[in-house]
Amino acid sequence: MRTLEHLFGAESPASGRELLCDRTFDLSSVASARAALAEHARARGLTDIDLTKFVLAVHEVMINSVRHGGGGGRLLLWCTADALHCHVDDDGPGIPPSLRNLRRRRPPVGRIGAGHGLWLAGQVCPGVRITDRAGGGAEVCLTYPLPGRGGPDQGAAAPGNCSPPGSGEASASGRR
């Protein structure tokens, strides 16, 4: 079993969590990354609307990385006892503060770069955390509760509970 310590060392905040998926992506590989994500999420118990919501949220963040974050990024997926966690990072300019309020009103239709993807991710995924990487780029961590093991009202998907690997040290991608 590959663990996050294997990639980031024993000091990783995600210590003891099994790494399910670690892959870089660009426009040509978003579909295969999304399929792998769905397969892992299904294997961990997400079905129907929960599976659709989680995969949609991660897909929107990946597309943002392709469009606005330098042409691609890196996706890490891991599981804890009560939730799936997905970390996406890129080498773009970061995400403007005005687009980080995921509970804001729907962005205007027809404006590219207005934050539709982040807004949608925030609507369908109970836990979304957006941070800037030192030296440039964005990190988005999505947390989705596993069925019967907790829920948003029980804190399983609170955005603060999603500790991306290597936070406070090197980024999850090792790209600083």
Predicted regions and their residues:
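A conserved short beta-strand within the histidine kinase catalytic ATPase domain
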Residues: G71-W78
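STAS-typified acidic loop motif
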Residues: L19-A35
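Short helix-loop "hinge" at the ATP-lid/N-box region of the Bergerat-fold HATPase_c
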Residues: S65-V66
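Glycine-rich phosphate-binding loop
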Residues: G110-C125
